Amino acid sequence: MTTTPLILLAAGGTGGHLFPAEALGVELMKRDLRVRLVTDSRALRYSGLFSKDMTDVVPSETVRGRSPLALARTGLMLATGTVVALNLMRRLKPAAVIGFGGYPTLPPLIAARLKGIPTVIHDANAVMGRANRLLSRRVNAIATSLPGVLDKEPSLIGKTTTTGTPMRPAILAASTVPFATPGSDGPLRVLVVGGSQGARVMSDIVPGAIEKLGSPLWQRLVLTQQVRDEDMARVRAVYERLRINAELAPFFADLPSRLASSHIIVSRSGAGTVAELGAIGRPSILVPLPGAIDQDQFANAGVLADVGGAIRIVQSDFTPDRLAAELSALAADPARLAAMAAAARTVGRLDAAERLADLVMKVARLDSPA
């Protein structure tokens, strides 16, 4: 009896890593392959393709400091995780292991290489992440969402393929919804999100910006905002005082459909968010996460801003006054919103899951006729 080949998908436990892994998993299952997820404990809070019986948790640790103690802790956790991952490889015997970034992918990818199992890494950012960079010279193939990510690494170009970011079925469904240009006096739907982990800066800045918009826009505004539990009371109080039509929650499971129904999205610029905005084609105001060593979110936001699909505001400039000015200008110019939506869609790639699945099957030597 022939056993159906298994592909292990390794991803850090946040939406930006997990959602592309889920999208690839769906495509591989369509091709009659089995898939499992290898991740860290954070991923267990997400519902989706990977049920608990399809998920293996491997000990891992993100680098959180440069002190000897912090580095020693990280090293110990990664070593422990690699031992666990080696046992996993022996038990599961996967045909290939695919990494989607984040330090939790290091143990399974290292274990796969030690066992001679084919490996692929996918990076969704405009600047390759640190974990993937550590793995890049040791894997069989590299997939990137954007062209030119490794132009300064000539030794890696030969094994690099630009696939785009695999999109979940819900995003693909949302991408079929055309942008509904708002009327000059009709509802203006604004969605504020901070990534899968939320962003306190949105709770600090957005309510003050909304207050500065004034009564005519307050009456038009239909606001949906992701707000952490600890910030909920103070944010809600502002909107209730202004009588804003606002829906607040720590997390929206139906985010793809909310993206599709929005006129303006205010968000961080994680790779997954930028890819989804391109796939669906919606105008956005993007605030890159500051302080990152490689400034990946700044570069990600540039992908949309450079084609006119987004407004990029660095966090030091992200004030209530600045946001209110941008929102007022967009609300007064429906034609500009429509143009931004069309521009954003030009960077979307809807066939990325198929392209990445083709690469995986090639590396795993599963693409030959039976």
From Swiss-Prot:
One of its GO terms (molecular function) is undecaprenyldiphospho-muramoylpentapeptide beta-N-acetylglucosaminyltransferase activity. CDD domains: GT28_MurG. Pathway: Cell wall biogenesis; peptidoglycan biosynthesis. One of its GO terms (cellular component) is plasma membrane. UDP-N-acetyl-alpha-D-glucosamine binds at T14, G15, G16, N125, R168, S196, Q297. It catalyses: di-trans,octa-cis-undecaprenyl diphospho-N-acetyl-alpha-D-muramoyl-L-alanyl-D-glutamyl-meso-2,6-diaminopimeloyl-D-alanyl-D-alanine + UDP-N-acetyl-alpha-D-glucosamine = di-trans,octa-cis-undecaprenyl diphospho-[N-acetyl-alpha-D-glucosaminyl-(1->4)]-N-acetyl-alpha-D-muramoyl-L-alanyl-D-glutamyl-meso-2,6-diaminopimeloyl-D-alanyl-D-alanine + UDP + H(+). Pfam families: Glyco_tran_28_C, Glyco_transf_28. The keyword Cell division applies. It is found in: Cell inner membrane. It is a peripheral membrane protein. Its EC number is 2.4.1.227. One of its GO terms (biological process) is carbohydrate metabolic process. Keywords: Cell cycle, Cell division, Cell inner membrane, Cell membrane, Cell shape, Cell wall biogenesis/degradation, Glycosyltransferase, Membrane, Peptidoglycan synthesis, Transferase. Transmembrane segments: none annotated. Belongs to the glycosyltransferase 28 family. MurG subfamily. NCBIfam families: murG. HAMAP family: MurG (MF_00033). Cell wall formation. Catalyzes the transfer of a GlcNAc subunit on undecaprenyl-pyrophosphoryl-MurNAc-pentapeptide (lipid intermediate I) to form undecaprenyl-pyrophosphoryl-MurNAc-(pentapeptide)GlcNAc (lipid intermediate II). This is UDP-N-acetylglucosamine--N-acetylmuramyl-(pentapeptide) pyrophosphoryl-undecaprenol N-acetylglucosamine transferase.
